[in-house]
């Protein structure tokens, strides 16, 4: 059972898939420590704007389960936080090249704390968010750091910037 962003209660995967929109390709999920923390993540706002249901993974094993299962009833799992949401026309084109100088400056200023700086396709009202792309997620990194720190598994740190946000527009001016 997983907490549903739209139903506001625990639901099964079968219930989630049964409610999916006809054109929805993925089972969207977001991982975090608490339902409240996940509910306030900036990375989920585009899915919420499109009235997409998000499963909230609060148990350390949940993300591993999605990674092992890969699909449920022919619907792949997709992280709302770390992957491309593939919402078609809802996403603006990659503007990283247009803002290359600003992004290079931000990355250089942050030193080794981020691997990449790019224009966000997820943010609407928030100025920035941190994502990990595909592969090791932040929740997996926390888990492995706690149980097997010698592995040194690290999530890739991608700083996504809302290029339409007043804070970025003021920075760029």
Regions found by a protein language model. Give the residues of each.
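Conserved GHKL (Bergerat-fold) ATPase module
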Residues: 1-173
């Amino acid at each position: 059972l997983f907490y549903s962003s739209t139903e506001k209660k625990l639901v099964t995967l079968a219930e989630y898939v049964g409610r999916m929109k006809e054109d929805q390709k993925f089972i969207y999920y977001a991982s975090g420590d608490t339902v409240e923390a996940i509910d306030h993540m900036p990375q989920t706002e585009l899915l919420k704007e499109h009235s997409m249901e998000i499963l909230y993974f609060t148990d350390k094993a949940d993300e591993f389960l999605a990674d092992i299962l890969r699909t449920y009833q022919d619907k792949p799992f997709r992280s709302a936080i770390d992957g491309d949401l593939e919402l078609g026309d809802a996403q603006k084109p990659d503007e990283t090249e247009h803002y290359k100088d600003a992004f290079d400056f931000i990355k250089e200023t942050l030193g080794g704390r981020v691997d990449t700086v790019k224009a966000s396709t997820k943010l609407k009202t928030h100025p920035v968010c941190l994502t990990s792309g595909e592969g090791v997620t932040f929740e997996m990194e926390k888990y492995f750091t706690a149980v097997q720190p010698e592995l040194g598994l690290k999530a890739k740190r991608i700083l996504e910037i809302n290029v339409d946000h007043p804070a970025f527009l003021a920075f760029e001016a």
